[in-house]
Amino acid sequence: MKFSVYDTGETAMNYQEAMKYMEKVGTYGIVPGLDSIRELCRRLGDPQNDLKFVHIAGTNGKGSTLAYISNILQAAGYRVGKYISPVIIDYCEKIQIGKQKITHKDLCEGLEIIKKHCDAMVSDGFHHPTPFEIETALAFWYFREKQCNIVVLETGMGGREDATNLITTTQVAVLASIGMDPVSYTHLRAHETRSNL
């Protein structure tokens, strides 16, 4: 289901409102698991199922690995979506096609659509998706809208329960170096860290 607030005559949030919304969502807390991202993407028409992925995990080196792989794919003629973190200057760096960041207009349109679904989810008894889950769903939505041939994305910090693990069309999975940083976040013992990725 393709829905655009611009097609209905409604006014989408502006960039500042979008950033305030994401900041507010960060105060809602986290419920471990994939239930929220799965439900949000279902309501968006499961955009991730129409995409192919190179999925990169690890403690260090994910960004460099993503840059190498996406540049190679782009040079080979693919329309490459990139989902990265952290950002250096601008929030829109998180979601790129080739070397072009998502525009403020597309970001706001996507977040407006997602916000409506999140509000409906809460009304239906679901936990509100986290900022990372919203960003991940936004990336999937945007890359499908822009018809990317392949998406290169980094995991977050959630191990098996990371929102990016919703994808089922991974073409290549890449492990960069793995350290102990995830232990404090996921509350795993040292020997469990690698098996949880």
Predicted regions and their residues:
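Positively charged, low-complexity intrinsically disordered leader regions
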Residues: 6, 13-50
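A conserved segment at the C-terminal end of the G1
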Residues: 64-79
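Conserved Switch II/interswitch segment of TRAFAC-class P-loop GTPases
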Residues: 180-182
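Conserved beta-strand/loop subsegment of P-loop NTPase cores
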Residues: 174-175
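ATP-dependent carboxylate-amine ligase catalytic core
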Residues: 10, 34, 39-41, 46-49, ...
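Hydrophobic anchor at the beta1->P-loop junction of P-loop NTPases
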Residues: 56
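Conserved small/polar residues in nucleotide/adenosyl-binding loops
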Residues: 186-193
